[in-house]
C-alpha cells in the first residue's frame, strides 16, 4: 500500500486523527477490536435519527422500515459467507453465539461419557462454555495440542477422533499467533468420525474469504466489532439439518 492510499484509509477513521502523548495514534490492536470508519458511524447515526423502532414488532412506518433494514443486513451477512438468510442468527458477539450452541444443541445432545474436542489454541470464549457443559453432562474434553511452531498437531486430532466425539470446536485463525488452521480438512475428518463442528471465525471472517458452504461446518461464529462494525452485534451461522 503506497503512502497516498494509506493516508486515504486513515482519513476514514475519525479516532485515528487524534494524538496520544503528543504523537499521531498508531492502533495495532484490531485483533481485540477494530476501529470504526465514518461510514459505520454515519449509518448508526442515520438509523437512530430516522428509523429507530423495534423490528418485527410493529406495523407502523418506522417499525416496518427498521425491520427492512434489519433483514437487509441479514441478507448482506448471508451473502458475505455464502449461505441463506434462514441460517443466520444475530447475537451480541461470538461469545454469546458459542454459549447459545452450548446451551441449546449441545445440552440436548452431549451426554454422560461423550467427548468434546477442543484445541490448545482456543480463546477462552471457546473453552469455558464447553467446560461448563462437560461438568453438567458428565462429558469429557480432549485437547488438540499445539506444536513448537504454533501449529495444531493433526496426529492429536486423529487420535481424539477415534473416540467418536459429539462435537469438535476450534478456531479458524488464532487470535494470538495468527496461525491459519486447515479448517476444511479438519472439518472433513471430524464429520467422518461422526462429530458436528463449530468453527470460531472471529479472526478469519474480517480478513479472508470464508465460504461456509465450501467449509461444510455445522456452526460458525464471528463478531461485528472485530470487522469495523459496532459493538453488540455478532453472528451465529447454523446449518439446517
Model regions and ranges:
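Pyridoxal 5′-phosphate
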Residues: 1-241
